[in-house]
Amino acid sequence: MDRTETRFRKRGQITGKITTSRQPHPQNEQSPQRSTSGYPLQEVVDDEMLGPSAPGVDPSPPCRSLGWKRKREWSDESEEEPEKELAPEPEETWVVEMLCGLKMKLKQQRVSSILPEHHKDFNSQLAPGVDPSPPHRSFCWKRKMEWWDESEESLEEEPRKVLAPEPEEIWVAEMLCGLKMKLKRRRVSLVLPEHHEAFNRLLEDPVIKRFLAWDKDLRVSDKYLLAMVIAYFSRAGFPSWQYQRIHFFLALYLANDMEEDDEDSKQNIFHFLYRKNRSRIPLLRKPWFQLGHSMNPRARKNRSRIPLLRKRRFQLYRSTNPRARKNRSRIPLLRKRRFQLYRSMNSRARKNRSQIVLFQKRRFHFFCSMSCRAWVSPEELEEIQAYDPEHWVWARDRAHLS
């Protein structure tokens, strides 16, 4: 029994110690707020010195390392620097785009933020002592620069080709009704007096004169097609002295291809240009026909008897007279002449074909020089004719023929 009592007494002492240790501290009772778990909330205050610490105790918290100090120093230096001025954003303004009567159409446009100071800074970087070339320019780049300098010198020596400027567009008042005005977009004609002079100079050419006199029905060269020739001269962009006879026929062929689209009329141009060679074809066919009929019926009869003569070679050799032998000997000669005429005709036909191909090739280059603009408006044709209305070319009207 004594042992059990001593055990219970020891247990009571231990429980008493535990209860005394769990009693709340008087300082913790003064805190007004408590957590839900029963433990007091701790307040952490940064940058606050609690007083001098003991000599062996480090006052800095363990979580603040050397990297944290560097960050603090960098943040302090950045605060001391003046704030960098930001580039102002481009402003937007409203600009008048079109004025139609009492109505005005506005267009939103941004104002550039480039100032004269930026140009000065850029020019200062291009000082004589500063090398503006980047360090990564290699030997290949030097070769390219040398080649570029040589090409520029060669271009300066060669005469520059004058390109035809594109036609500008303007707005013309088409109708005015009260306070309302109807506008119409219209292209400004690029035909200059130089082009009219070049056209008049080509009309004095004897070949072109014969061509206009040859086209009596005006199927290929009426006044509208000839006015299109002047318009094409202005669009091609060549100097006025450079236009020759072939350019007149190239422009006229393009005009017929654009307006008429008649193969017969275009073939008439080829027939007139190459009629010296083409006119010989019927002359070649005529002697061919004459030589075909030059063999008399008796010679044809002897020719049909050739298989029979072969069968009866010995008898026919005696029966045939010298005249039949003479007709038979003429057959190879006729074949030879017919073959020669056929070859001569084919060579001339090939020559004509090659000339037509060359003409079509030059027509394509002329069309590309006009920037592929072959359509001419009726207003532009009227302006071209109004430049010199008394010219004899404008009297070539198909309506006057009927």
Swiss-Prot record:
Signal peptide: none annotated. It comes from the Eukaryota. Coiled coil: none annotated. Residues 16-39 have a biased composition (Polar residues). GO terms for molecular function: protein kinase binding. Residues 1-89 are annotated as: Disordered. Residues 76-89 have a biased composition (Acidic residues). It holds the Pfam family Spy1. Belongs to the Speedy/Ringo family. This is Speedy protein E2B. It comes from Homo sapiens.
